[in-house]
Amino acid sequence: IGSNYIQYMFKKYDNEIRIINVDKLTYAGNLENLKDIEDRENYTFVKADICDADAINKIFEENEIDRVVHFAAESHVDRSIKNPDVFVKTNVLGTLVMLNAAKAAWELPDGTFKEGKKFLHVSTDEVYGSLEEEGEYFYETTPYDPHSPYSASKASSDMLVKSYMDTYKFPANITNCSNNYGPYQFPEKLIPLIINNALQGKSLPVYGDGKNVRDWLYVEDHAKGIDMVQEKGRLFETYNIGGHNEKQNIQIIHIILDTLQEMLPEGDPRKELVSEKLITYVEDRKGHDRRYAIAPDKIKEEVGWYPETMFEDGIRLTIKWFFENEEWMKNVTSGDYQKYYEDMYQDK
């Protein structure tokens, strides 16, 4: 999401802004995501861990930071089940480091904060738990009920940001988004995983009965929403950003397969590989939430944002991007990714 946000911001504001991109470059980080902007004079990349207070404080000391958009997080639920420690460290302690660094840089002697400063914490709808009935939606007032180590770590980080807003009047907002998809998404996530496997004739793993429902948000729509909250959102408020594109996981797979068949040219050998026969049902994920769905009423009413990309259109754009960036996919699915994939799905 961070890569797409940076691309969006430069496309919209060009030379009116300067962006400092801080990334630890874990397994899912890839500098190639931003290679077309790396030579811009108003773009700086800093390799750093958000848990490293000295490194983060140094960035604030050496630069006049007006806004922070805090994307950095461990975000894959399956990984959190196998290794929750990493999620607590990055998502909770890392957020604390970011809050403390921004507070130290922005706070005035009288306890107020410099004009125009804002911290935006990017979070997830998974903190709200699971919905059972159609017609029910997550609102900003929905009580938190996380069910996985990932969602618990994000809920904890949200609470930290809320505590800083309440205790110090720290200038911040929180956004909770639904499932993102689009260019540059690491193929541990459902949509790029299915696209990549289908094109290679590999099995398409589906948890449980495949009827878990997610609300899908095209990543550029999300980037626009974050920018609009930064520009127009009321301080200390939470905004839900959702796509109004609810689909069962098995529906997603069928849509991807149909779209691949439609978009692959005649004579392309991959066309014969793409088949529903690849669908493989595997043991359900532990604590698997049944349904997520966001009500984006507040962000629409207060800042004028709404999702512009229908799911079928977004999938076509996503597949087109993967067709045009096959080398990127080859690079990110080599080495460590193969071991991860085997650990996640081989024995299920």
Task: Give the predicted meaning of each segment.
Residues 1-180, 230, 259, 290, ...:
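N-terminal Rossmann-like NAD(P)+-binding domain of SDR-like oxidoreductases, especially those catalyzing
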Residues 4-8, 12, 48-51, 174, ...:
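C-terminal substrate-binding subdomain of Rossmann-fold SDR/epimerase-dehydratase oxidoreductases
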Residues 27, 183, 243:
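Short, conserved catalytic or interaction motifs in soluble domains
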Residues 30-33, 83, 186-190, 252, ...:
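Residues at alpha-helix caps and immediate loop-helix transition turns in enzyme cores, especially N-
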Residues 37, 134, 187-195:
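A glycine/serine/threonine-rich, flexible loop-to-helix segment
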Residues 55, 86, 93, 186-190, ...:
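Residue-level recognition of oxygen-bearing side chains
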